[in-house]
Amino acid sequence: LGDVHGGAGEQCAELYNDVAKIMEKEDIDIAVIQGLDKWREKYGEIVSGFGHRFHKPVDPRAPLLMSKVREAAENNVVSGVFADIGEKVQEEIGKQRGNKPIAMNIDGATAVIFCELGFPAPLSRGLFCLSRSVGILAHGWEQMQMGGRNKGPMPPSILPTYKSN
């Protein structure tokens, strides 16, 4: 787990929080441009949370999550401000690429969710690990329920013995 796998959501949440802070004095369009400029000064040209090497032109997971955020905003569960920011960032990156659209990926969408729920950006990596841990636990349990030997160290009773002559 590093800055690309697991850390991208943290970096994206940092961007969204920076944009939200700028929005205290500027409108969303200006805030997004300034936020992206600040982010790129720190991290470089590629913006975490957007684009995917396999899911093109759309990461199919992101629109589903974003629709759930929009639904929660309609029901006053969350504000929807970070959903607006995420979608505006996506739009602005596309404009800056010569009107070439870019997909919000799963990290961009989960960063929206974490920000909407009030989690500080540094907790995003831990939340990513937590969700993966639940999946690993479920997979292990499923394998155990199938019966038979589960992959792992060989029991000592069936290890081959090597004797020198």
Which residues does each PLM region occupy?
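Non-transmembrane, aqueous-exposed alpha-helical and coiled segments at domain scale
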Residues: 1-165
